[in-house]
């Protein structure tokens, strides 16, 4: 029951960090300000001459207090030294934050308790530092640091609070009760010390339960920078902290503490209420003391300095014991900052880095293809099956398999122990470990035990042994990436498996696979990965569109395409730029349902077309997403089959998955009103997706965009090398009449699909959707005072595009989206990035149309393609697969 309550508390605090932090700080400031502004305004030594009660200050008291301060500083130093052994700057920073804020809360409480008398704080701080226990705070931080995502951070903090909260609460209670016994001793100094101790314990507990978990959650959220799908603060040697901490609380110890606390409660109750002397006597004595104090009235004096100067002088004036304490603190701080790192690294170098490596993330290179950190990187002679396929498995395995940890300048990942990601290479010591493997693959049973072992795992198996397990059906081939220590090794092993089954074993030699962030691919973009396909990316621009300039990335293997589009962009820019508008925005999904009779289908159709029916379906549809908002239904019949075309906004996502989820929920709601309805398929090709369809050309799908520009006659002659009249003539007879003669649907253009597909591949879109997205009609007219200028427009009714999800999560594709300023979701106006990308696509299509039509009108098309789009390699010197086979 208690664990569940603490778990709920931890989840709430971690999920609302800003609210908790602001609330805690506000409460602390309120405690201080209420005392400052409601107390008296007498400040002894500044504006009042207060009566002094002389007390004998023994030199032994000063010595004891100095020793206590030094011990407290040493204690804090050793605690931070132990934390540094973990090798995480986040643990240190978070622990420091905990210490600083705990001190602030404790100081506030002491000042409030002593009515602004700061001399008591000087004596209290050493006891506070001695009672700080960073082990609990660091344990909770470890829970958070073992997470892979921000949601997992919250869950792990909640789990940590469920495990640590009851224990820490009981410990705080017992400490307060034990230390509180000293407040009943009758010795004034001991009572003050014990009172400070109790306040210290309570301040620590308050910060640990409120401010600290919220701060951990917020710090990790703000510092989250993904690398191979994991945050930069994720430490692999914290992966087992959960199971370790779950077994920590000792039931016997817990019971003893509970019995102790009950006994101490009885002691306090007996001493304070049962055995307390007569309250009348104490009241009389108190009144006498009060009267005595009142007789010696404080005298008001005129302050000689300002209040801040008064407090500053009190802080600057130091006694010999304070000089000793500050000197010790300064020396330890210098040692910790400048000399501790090398000692820590030399100590950690003796430990096994296989179980606790800290991977140092590096900044991504300019091409945005990040290198995946490899915990274990095989050498080129790693196993009997080489990295490149086509090698027989009969070759022997190397006996020694080095695990190399290289420096930042190398092509492999770097392991840095006890240092942050920005540490210099000198501090980043490297080491080479060796794992001995038998010369022959071990039996499957032994390999399975190693694979399933928490201490060893796949890194202790050779590639030949992994392949042996795959062939024996112990490892599914599609799970290689998730079971290996790195995704790249899983891809490598799959290539080796595949090479033996290909007609040409060396077929994959020139298909690259190294140094790619496969964590962004898995579960999102592709399965059974064997590498990635590099495609040349060119840039066309600047495209002057709606008063802005864009450099448009285009991934293509067709020569002349980028150059031609670039010429069109130049012509548009010289003509003053293009203008565009988004006419409609709505993705569609068209399921098919069946009813017993055609009349029943007609009844459902009529009900869906009523405002009441549409409202019911819209409520069900809209409940599935923050962005999906049903706009309209287009319903048609074919016999007893009913086709319902849902159209909805989908924010910055292309939206097929989003609208499919909403459609499914809406159909289930519709089935409640018409139980006899049968759902045949959530997609009945009435959408229509990735197929030529007149409904997309007429009704639109995705973004409907129109773009226009006026090209001056001079630009037509000098840049496009033709005339306005010739271009209009070719456009009418080619794009309009020619397409009509061919029975084209939406193909009233020269080559819109070229530009659309090139941009789609570069920007991570679904390339198959160029079928509908390339629907375009290009119109040209004579314009200007003398009808020599060229007016051109492109209307594209079905651009299916998005800036989040799918391939847009891949880093190279994100780089291309960033070139256009539309990467990710638009926070201010959801959907605006996707709409802007659709405008850019339409504007670039118009540039491509302009240039190609000019080339056709001038007769330059064949000549340019002979220069830029023709291979100059003598193919007779190369033997293809079929030629080689026949030979």
Swiss-Prot record:
Domain of life: Eukaryota
EC number, UniProt record: 1.1.1.34
Subcellular localization, as worded in the UniProt entry: Endoplasmic reticulum membrane; Peroxisome membrane
Positions of glycan attachment: 281
Gene Ontology cellular component terms for the protein in this record: endoplasmic reticulum; endoplasmic reticulum membrane; peroxisomal membrane
Covalent cross-link site, Glycyl lysine isopeptide (Lys-Gly) (interchain with G-Cter in ubiquitin): 89, 248
Catalytic activity: (R)-mevalonate + 2 NADP(+) + CoA = (3S)-3-hydroxy-3-methylglutaryl-CoA + 2 NADPH + 2 H(+)
Residues forming the catalytic site: 558 (charge relay system), 690 (charge relay system), 766 (charge relay system), 865 (proton donor)
GO molecular-function term, one example from the UniProt record: GTPase regulator activity
Post-translational note: N-glycosylated. Glycosylated with high mannose chains including Man(6)(GlcNAc)(2), Man(7)(GlcNAc)(2) and Man(8)(GlcNAc)(2). Deglycosylated by NGLY1 on release from the endoplasmic reticulum (ER) in a sterol-mediated manner.
Xref: CDD domains: HMG-CoA_reductase_classI
Key words of the record: Cholesterol biosynthesis, Cholesterol metabolism, Endoplasmic reticulum, Glycoprotein, Isopeptide bond, Lipid biosynthesis, Lipid metabolism, Membrane, NADP, Oxidoreductase, Peroxisome, Phosphoprotein, Steroid biosynthesis, Steroid metabolism, Sterol biosynthesis, Sterol metabolism, Transmembrane, Transmembrane helix, Ubl conjugation
Keyword presence, Membrane: yes
Protein's UniProt keywords contain Oxidoreductase: yes
Segments on the Cytoplasmic face: 1-9, 79-89, 150-159, 221-248, 340-887
Metabolic or biological pathway, per its Swiss-Prot or TrEMBL entry: Metabolic intermediate biosynthesis; (R)-mevalonate biosynthesis; (R)-mevalonate from acetyl-CoA: step 3/3
SSD domain: residues covered: 61-218
Activity: how regulated: Regulated by a negative feedback mechanism through sterols and non-sterol metabolites derived from mevalonate. Phosphorylation at Ser-871 down-regulates the catalytic activity.
InterPro entries membership: HMG_CoA_Rdtase, HMG_CoA_Rdtase_cat_sf, HMG_CoA_Rdtase_CS, HMG_CoA_Rdtase_eu_arc, HMG_CoA_Rdtase_metazoan, HMG_CoA_Rdtase_N, HMG_CoA_Rdtase_NAD(P)-bd_sf, HMG_CoA_Rdtase_sub-bd_dom_sf
Lumenal topological intervals: 40-56, 115-123, 188-191, 276-314
Motif INSIG-binding motif positions after renumbering to this chain: 75-78
Alphabetical GO biological process terms: cholesterol biosynthetic process; coenzyme A metabolic process; isoprenoid biosynthetic process; long-term synaptic potentiation; negative regulation of amyloid-beta clearance; negative regulation of protein catabolic process; negative regulation of protein secretion; regulation of ERK1 and ERK2 cascade
Record-stated family: Belongs to the HMG-CoA reductase family.
Function, as annotated: Catalyzes the conversion of (3S)-hydroxy-3-methylglutaryl-CoA (HMG-CoA) to mevalonic acid, the rate-limiting step in the synthesis of cholesterol and other isoprenoids, thus plays a critical role in cellular cholesterol homeostasis.
Protein name: 3-hydroxy-3-methylglutaryl-coenzyme A reductase
Source lineage: Eukaryota, Metazoa, Chordata, Craniata, Vertebrata
């Amino acid at each position: 029951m208690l664990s569940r309550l603490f778990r709920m508390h931890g989840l709430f605090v971690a999920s609302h960090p800003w609210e908790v932090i602001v609330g805690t700080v506000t409460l602390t400031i309120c405690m201080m300000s209420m005392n400052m502004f409601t107390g008296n305004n007498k400040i002894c030594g500044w504006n009042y001459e207060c009566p002094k009660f002389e007390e004998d200050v023994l030199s032994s008291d000063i010595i004891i207090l100095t020793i206590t301060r030094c011990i407290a500083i040493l204690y804090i130093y050793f605690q931070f030294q132990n934390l540094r052994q973990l090798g995480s700057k986040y643990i240190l920073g978070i622990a420091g934050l905990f210490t600083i804020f705990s001190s602030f809360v404790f100081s506030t409480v002491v000042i409030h308790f002593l009515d602004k008398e700061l001399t008591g704080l000087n004596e209290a701080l050493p006891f506070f530092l001695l009672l700080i226990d960073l082990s609990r705070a660091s344990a909770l931080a470890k829970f958070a640091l073992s997470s892979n995502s921000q949601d997992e951070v919250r869950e792990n903090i909640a789990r940590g609070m469920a495990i640590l909260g009851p224990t820490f609460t009981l410990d705080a209670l017992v400490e307060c009760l034990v230390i509180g016994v000293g407040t009943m001793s009758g010795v004034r100094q001991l009572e003050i010390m014990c009172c400070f101790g109790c306040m210290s314990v309570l301040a620590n507990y308050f910060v640990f339960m409120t401010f600290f978990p919220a701060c951990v959650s917020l710090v990790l959220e703000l510092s989250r920078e993904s690398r191979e799908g994991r945050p930069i603060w994720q430490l692999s040697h914290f992966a087992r902290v959960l199971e370790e901490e779950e077994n920590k609380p000792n039931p016997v110890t817990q019971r003893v503490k509970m019995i102790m606390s009950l006994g101490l409660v009885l002691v306090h109750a007996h001493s304070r209420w049962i055995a307390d002397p007569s309250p009348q006597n104490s009241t009389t004595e108190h009144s006498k003391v009060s009267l005595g104090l009142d007789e010696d009235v404080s005298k008001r004096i005129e302050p000689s300095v300002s209040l801040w100067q008064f407090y500053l002088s009190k802080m600057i004036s130091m006694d010999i014991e304070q000089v000793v304490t500050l000197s010790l603190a300064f020396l330890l701080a210098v040692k910790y900052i400048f000399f501790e790192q090398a000692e820590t690294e030399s100590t950690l170098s003796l430990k096994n880095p296989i179980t606790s490596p800290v991977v140092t993330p590096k900044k991504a290179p300019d091409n945005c293809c990040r290198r995946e950190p490899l915990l274990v990187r095989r050498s080129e002679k790693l196993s009997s099956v080489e990295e490149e396929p086509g090698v027989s498995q009969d070759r022997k395995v190397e006996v020694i398999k080095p695990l190399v940890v290289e420096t930042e300048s190398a092509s492999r990942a770097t392991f840095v122990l006890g240092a942050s990601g920005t540490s210099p290479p000198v501090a980043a010591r490297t080491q080479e470990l060796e794992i001995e493997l038998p010369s022959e693959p071990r039996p499957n049973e032994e390999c399975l035990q190693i694979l399933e072992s928490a201490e060893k795992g796949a890194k202790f198996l050779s590639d030949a042994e992994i392949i042996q397990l795959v062939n024996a059906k112990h490892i599914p081939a599609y799970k290689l990436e998730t079971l290996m220590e790195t995704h790249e090794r899983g891809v490598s092993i799959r290539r080796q498996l595949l090479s033996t089954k290909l007609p040409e074993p060396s077929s994959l030699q020139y298909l690259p696979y190294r140094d790619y962030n496969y964590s962004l691919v898995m579960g999102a973009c592709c399965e059974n990965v064997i590498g990635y396909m590099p495609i040349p990316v060119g840039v066309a621009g600047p495209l002057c569109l709606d008063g802005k300039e864009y450099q448009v990335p285009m991934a293509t293997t067709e020569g002349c395409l980028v150059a031609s589009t670039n010429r069109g962009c130049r012509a548009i820019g010289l003509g003053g730029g293009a203008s565009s508008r988004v006419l409609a925005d709505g993705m569609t999904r068209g399921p098919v349902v069946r009813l017993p009779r055609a009349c029943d289908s007609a009844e459902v159709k009529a009900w869906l077309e009523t405002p009441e029916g549409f409202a019911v379906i819209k409520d069900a549809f809209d409940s599935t997403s923050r962005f999906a908002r049903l706009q309209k239904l287009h319903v048609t019949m074919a016999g007893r089959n009913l086709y319902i075309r849902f159209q909805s906004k989908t924010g910055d996502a292309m939206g097929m998955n989003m609208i499919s989820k909403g459609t499914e929920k809406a159909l289930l709601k519709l089935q409640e009103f018409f139980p006899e309805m049968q759902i045949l398929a959530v997609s009945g090709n009435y959408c229509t997706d990735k197929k030529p369809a007149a409904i997309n050309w007429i009704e639109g799908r995705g973004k409907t965009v129109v773009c226009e520009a006026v090209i001056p006659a001079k630009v037509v002659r000098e840049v496009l090398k033709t005339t306005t009249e010739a271009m209009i003539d070719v456009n009418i007879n080619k794009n309009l009449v020619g397409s009509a003669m061919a029975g084209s649907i939406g193909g009233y253009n020269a080559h819109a699909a070229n530009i659309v597909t090139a941009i789609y591949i570069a920007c991570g879109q679904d390339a198959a959707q160029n079928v509908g997205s390339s629907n375009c009609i290009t119109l040209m007219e004579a314009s200007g005072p003398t009808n020599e200028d060229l007016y051109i427009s492109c209307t594209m009714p079905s651009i299916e595009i998005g800036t989040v999800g799918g391939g847009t999560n891949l880093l190279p594709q994100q780089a291309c989206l960033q070139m256009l300023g539309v990467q990710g979701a638009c926070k201010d106006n959801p959907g605006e990035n996707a709409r802007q990308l659709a405008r850019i696509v339409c504007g670039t299509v118009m540039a491509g149309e302009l240039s190609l039509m000019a080339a056709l009108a001038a007769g330059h098309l064949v000549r340019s393609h002979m220069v830029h789009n023709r291979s100059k390699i003598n193919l007779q010197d190369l033997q293809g697969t079929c030629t080689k086979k026949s030979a």
